A protein has these predicted regions:
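Structural signature for solvent-exposed beta-strand/loop edge elements and short helix-capping sites
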Residues: 1-337, 447-448, 626-628, 643, ...
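Residues in well-ordered beta-strands of folded domains
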Residues: 193, 220, 238, 277, ...
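Structured loops at beta-to-helix junctions and adjacent beta-edge loops in soluble globular domains
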Residues: 154, 190, 222, 240, ...
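Conserved aromatic-histidine-acidic binding/catalytic patches
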Residues: 253, 329, 366, 454, ...
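Outer-membrane beta-barrel translocator/pore domains, especially the C-terminal barrels
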Residues: 103, 113-115, 138-139, 143, ...
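Carboxylate/His-rich catalytic cores and anion/metal-binding grooves
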Residues: 181-218, 304-306, 357-407
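Recognizes the extracellular SEMA beta-propeller fold with strongest preference
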Residues: 290-317, 331-357, 370-378, 383-390
Length: 718
């Protein structure tokens, strides 16, 4: 049936047209297209051409042109002129795949208005940012238009109820409003319930709807307890100044009337970004900090970065744990301010330069500052003819430094380095060689590093390295073996760096600069021998590994670092042993044994054991005999009782001094919408001016709304 006048098309197996009443009846499944705007699927439809009303008592589906779907379970009455639908029960799936249901409702398709009872909104799972959520909003009645949606007597939660008796939290409100103009969710006269128990009452609060990426408003508040500082409440407020600027105010209030006002400012420019963090604490004496970073570009090939760090009290950062509240703080004991430039002159040439100021907060005022103005790094790769079978690089580095009030150093170091390509023999031996010519220049006054006031030296090193990669395939595994030989010749003089704390291990044994110095080379002639063995299973996973190496010298050299044993004719035997016994147990052992295997100077043992939901790892590090006298043990243990219940334990202890640096025991209950934990933590400081901090903390996060953190005893008392 086609009605050109009213722009209606009806398709059905059987239809009756009553010419007297001007009505069309369908008596089977029916498809109807209205004004090229709506597609209607139903059965037994009545179309009254006089009143322009479509009605049916059967289940009916309507789809519009913007991917919204309407299902009327108990039929409908559709006024096609006003585009108003009345129905006893409506289901809607919008273009964002959210589901809505109403009873005894009226729906105005033209003005996007809804009025109904017993409303239920079943949001798509990731609507609030977590695909494990099952967000839902229910109410007794709804009135909605293009500007606002109001739902009365509502219950809202994002919690997943799968395999649970109840949702983790619910928000019961007298009135819920979605302000579509301001893009706000607003709640009036609300009770916040946790596991069906009323926790606190909120007369009013709001938060941005999920379409908002940046909007001014309060961020997650949190409450924290500390044995040193007492309890504190932080209520951060985010202010979006513009699309490129924002400001976050993070006031921290203590129960003893102390406070810290901390703020963060960010701004994005066309070719740069600025971030600044600063705070003020006024108790006895005013303490504050100011940290800022500006980084950007000049054109396509030049990067720059400016960093400024300042505090007015040396222990302020540690005492108040400022680092926890900003990403700008890397160290609580050393401040670093600098201006740096990095320029790519061409594809083979690069220049970096920096002016720096270091401030060591653990030292007296007169000796705490170190100035570097500037340091630089210039590198150039020089393309050679193919006949040279290698590449050439020129590297120039240097700095000018003043430290500890009256100590001065200026250094320029020039490296001319040739590295050959690999040579592979018919039997598979892979060899390469390198030549280094180093020109070192320094001027110093009262230096603790350089003895000579004026020093100009030339150093040279020749390295030849050969290795033979071998592979053997077995029925259940594959073995790899690689013997390594390195010849080193450095006929020029060196410097006395015997007191350096440098230590060699297998990972740097064959490195050209294994002593870790840019101002000299390793003097003398040596042969370095070693091998790497690895066993892999059929999945190409490593199950066993052993690496060993040793350095042979033609004579002693007391100027080289004692810990490296490169000052002897034979170094320590250094290596690594890795063994994965099974999927549950993994061992990793790094060692440095005396050349005669009489004793061990260094041991680092890492053991990781996991069984089902239990995993623990131990890291034991000891230095003995020639390397000193230290012994540290660390442990991290995690027991996953279930997907939502976890126990964690961390500890670090100095066994020689019987000094526990840190330990923490925590229990966590975490779901898709709720995190609750008890945490006992104690932190010790070797700095005598700081008192150990001990806290028993209860933490609860209502995701995505709020966080409460406090001393556990105060939670129980109240």
């Amino acid at each position: 049936y086609i009605d050109d006048k009213q722009d209606v098309i009806i398709e059905s197996q059987k239809m009756i047209y009553n010419e007297l009443d001007n009505k069309v009846f369908s008596q089977s499944e029916t498809f109807l297209e209205l004004e090229n705007k709506y597609e209607i699927k139903s059965s037994n439809i009545l179309f009254d051409r006089n009143l322009n009303i479509i009605s049916s008592s059967e289940i009916t589906e309507i789809n519009d042109k913007i991917a919204n779907k309407f299902i009327f379970e108990k039929g409908l009455i559709f006024d096609t002129i006003r585009e108003i639908i009345s129905s006893k029960k409506i289901f809607i799936k919008d273009q964002n795949l959210n589901n809505y249901s109403f009873e005894n409702s009226k729906l105005n398709l033209k003005d996007n208005e809804v009025a109904g009872k017993d409303v239920k909104v079943d949001f798509v799972d990731n609507f609030f940012g977590n695909e494990n959520n099952d967000p839902i909003l229910k109410g007794s009645s709804i009135v909605s238009n293009n500007k606002n949606t109001k739902i009365y007597k509502t219950v809202f939660s994002t919690c997943n109820k799968k395999n649970k008796n109840c949702r983790g939290w619910e928000l019961q409100s007298e009135i819920f409003t979605h302000n579509k103009t301001k893009k706000l969710f607003e709640y009036e006269k609300s009770w916040f319930k946790v596991f069906e128990k009323k926790i606190f009452y909120l007369p009013y609060f709001n938060h941005p709807d999920p379409t908002v990426k940046r909007k001014s408003g309060f961020l997650t508040p949190f409450y924290k307890g500390s044995s040193n500082l007492g309890s504190s409440l932080t209520i951060p407020y985010f202010y979006s100044i513009s699309n490129s600027k924002d400001f976050t105010f993070k006031p921290r209030f203590y129960l003893d009337n102390d406070y810290i006002f901390q703020s963060e400012y960010r701004e994005a420019f066309k070719n740069s970004n600025l971030i600044a963090d600063f705070s003020l604490n006024r108790k006895d004496n005013t303490s504050s900090h100011f940290f800022t970073e500006l980084e950007g570009k000049f054109g396509d090939n030049t990067d720059y970065k400016i960093q400024i760090q300042n505090v007015t009290n040396d222990s302020y950062l540690k005492i108040h744990n400022i680092k926890e509240y900003t990403s700008l703080i890397d160290s609580e004991s050393t401040l670093t301010s600098y201006i740096s430039l990095e320029k790519d002159i061409d594809e083979n040439t690069k220049l970096d330069s920096t002016i720096k100021l270091y401030e060591d907060l653990s030292k007296e005022d007169s000796d705490k500052y170190q100035y570097i103005f500037p340091d630089f790094n210039f590198s150039k790769n020089i393309n050679l003819d193919e006949s040279y079978n290698g590449n050439f690089q020129f590297l120039s580095t240097g700095f000018q430094k003043v430290y500890e009030t009256n100590k001065y150093e200026a250094l320029i170091n020039n490296d001319f380095n040739f590295n050959s390509f690999d040579y592979i023999t018919k039997v598979g031996i892979v060899s390469d060689y390198s030549l280094l010519l180093k020109n070192f220049n320094s001027y110093s006054e009262n230096s603790t590093e350089y003895e000579k006031k004026n020093d100009h030296e030339i150093f040279g090193t020749f390295l030849l390295k050969s290795e033979l990669p071998l592979k053997k395939e077995l029925e259940n595994s594959t073995n790899f073996l690689k013997p390594i030989l390195q010849l080193r010749a450095s006929p020029t003089n060196g410097k006395n760096i015997s007191s350096s704390d440098t230590r060699i291990e297998f990972d740097n044994l064959f490195s050209p600069n294994r002593i870790g110095r840019s101002d000299m080379v390793e003097k003398g002639n040596s042969i370095t021998l070693g091998f790497e063995f690895e066993k892999q299973n059929l999945n190409d996973s490593k199950i066993l590994g052993l690496s060993l190496g040793n350095v042979l010298k033609d004579k002693k050299n007391d100027d080289l670092p004692t810990k490296t044993k490169l000052n002897q004719t034979r170094s320590d035997i250094v290596g690594n042993l890795y063994y994965k016994l099974n999927k549950n147990l993994e061992l990793n052992y790094n060692f440095s044994y005396d050349k005669d295997l009489e004793y061990s100077n260094y041991d680092s043992v890492e053991a990781t054991f996991g069984l089902n939901k239990f995993i623990t790892s131990f890291d034991y590090i000891t230095e003995n005999h020639d390397f000193g006298d230290s012994e540290i043990i660390k442990n991290v243990t995690k027991y996953k009782i279930s997907d939502e219940h976890i126990i964690n334990f961390n500890i670090t202890k100095d066994l020689k001094d019987d000094f526990t640096q840190f330990y923490k025991l925590s229990y966590e209950h975490e779901t898709d919408c709720l995190l609750a934990s008890f945490e006992y933590q104690k932190t010790f400081f070797r700095d005598g001016s700081l008192v150990p901090d001990e806290s028993l903390v209860f933490l609860i996060k209502f995701i995505p709304f709020a966080e409460i953190r406090g001393a556990a005893n105060s939670v129980f008392e109240n």
